[in-house]
Design a protein with these regions (language model features):
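P-loop (Walker A) phosphate-binding loop of NTP-binding proteins
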Residues: 9
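ATP-binding Walker
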Residues: 12
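Conserved substrate/cofactor phosphate-moiety recognition/catalytic segment
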Residues: 19-68
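Small-molecule kinase domains that catalyze NTP-dependent phosphoryl transfer to phosphate-bearing small molecules
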Residues: 121-165, 177
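Hydrophobic anchor at the beta1->P-loop junction of P-loop NTPases
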Residues: 6
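Glycine-rich phosphate-binding loop used to anchor ATP phosphates in small-molecule kinases
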Residues: 55-99
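Walker A/P-loop
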Residues: 15
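Conserved phosphate-donor/acceptor-positioning beta-strand/loop module used by diverse small-molecule
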Residues: 99-120, 152
Length: 177
């Protein structure tokens, strides 16, 4: 088994799609990378703050090591979160590959207006609702460079269709790193 890194901007449907993907397997794990940040009790820096780089590297490495451990034990594993190539993809990929586990990467894409509307419907930290923060994070997914082939346009799809699109690309080997 390998690890699927499922990414995209806030509000694109990552958590819902990851949950649906987990339902497709007898033994599956869905790790929400964001939850690993909650373990920091003192000294936490919001992950989108430029000063959080070192913290983000540590947290994402730990999340990736956890994902790799589950995959090595035979679980179909999805590590879901905001994983941007120039921010944290490298450290995540290195940790998973160091465990000898195959890794795949999928980026869900939808219009920023649709993602922002979904975020506004949520309850939670008001900082992530800041339109400037949302726009800055979403812009990071506009040009993925060498990882552009890992993008999946989910505009107009419901969650089930998006999960099926990811599963098809994953099974076809198109998302492997």
């Amino acid at each position: 088994m390998g690890v699927l890194i499922l990414s995209g901007p806030p509000g694109v449907g990552k958590t819902t799609v990851a949950g649906l993907l987990a339902c497709r397997s007898e033994t599956a794990v869905h790790l929400e990378a964001d939850r690993f940040f909650f373990f920091i009790r003192n000294g936490f820096i919001e992950p989108w703050d430029p000063a959080s780089h070192e913290q983000n590297q540590v947290v994402m490495r730990i999340a990736a090591e956890s994902a790799a451990s589950y995959a090595a034990a035979g679980y179909a594993t999805t590590l879901e979160g905001i994983v941007i190539p120039r921010w944290t993809l490298g450290v995540i990929r290195e940790a998973i590959e160091a465990a000898g586990v195959p890794v795949a990467y999928a980026v869900l894409r939808a219009p920023q207006s649709a993602c922002a509307a979904r975020v506004e419907e949520r309850e939670g930290s008001p900082d992530i609702f800041d339109p400037a923060v949302l726009a800055r994070i979403a812009a990071e997914f506009d040009d993925l460079g060498e990882f552009e082939r890992n993008a999946i346009d989910v505009a107009g799809m419901d969650a089930g269709q998006a999960a099926a699109a990811v599963a098809a690309r994953l099974e076809g080997g198109d998302l492997a790193l």
